[in-house]
Amino acid sequence: MDEQHQPWPLIFLRPSGARFEISVAAWQTMQGFIQHASNATEAGGVLLGRHLRDGSAIIVDAVTAPMAGDRRARTRFHRAQQRHQAAIDAAWAASEGTRTYLGEWHTHPERIPTPSPVDRADWHRRLLQDRYTAPLFFMIVGTAAVAVWEGHRPDVIVQLAGFIPGA
């Protein structure tokens, strides 16, 4: 593949100045569910990855895709908790404790994605109820853009700035 058509990871800047990076492989999985067709349903899953020890970046190197039991509609996605949790547990075990749950992703049938009231309520619920010690990330994949938010307890949510490497 020539350099001009080389796939790049997606990189977002966190408020701390560190990077939040989506690997090419993870991004390619999500791209397969972009809602270009008028009858396409929302899709989603969990973000899996690693915190670099030096604190310079968090890398999403895998995602779960829609699974049996997920509920999908044109403007709604609800993931089956147990099946995605099994994938989280398997990733953790296979990596000997280095690949972890980082957050959630889903698609929207709009060019520039904006969180719905249902999305925001779900994010706030996760920040209050999920068991975690690091920030959680919430990613929405639109038909022409991607947006990522970083969440901290109890309910602070900030949109991250994105950029394209090599641009």
Q: What residue spans do the PLM features occupy?
A:
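Conserved beta-strand-loop surface patch within small alpha/beta domains used
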Residues: 1-101, 110-167
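Histidine-centered divalent metal-coordination motifs
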Residues: 106-108
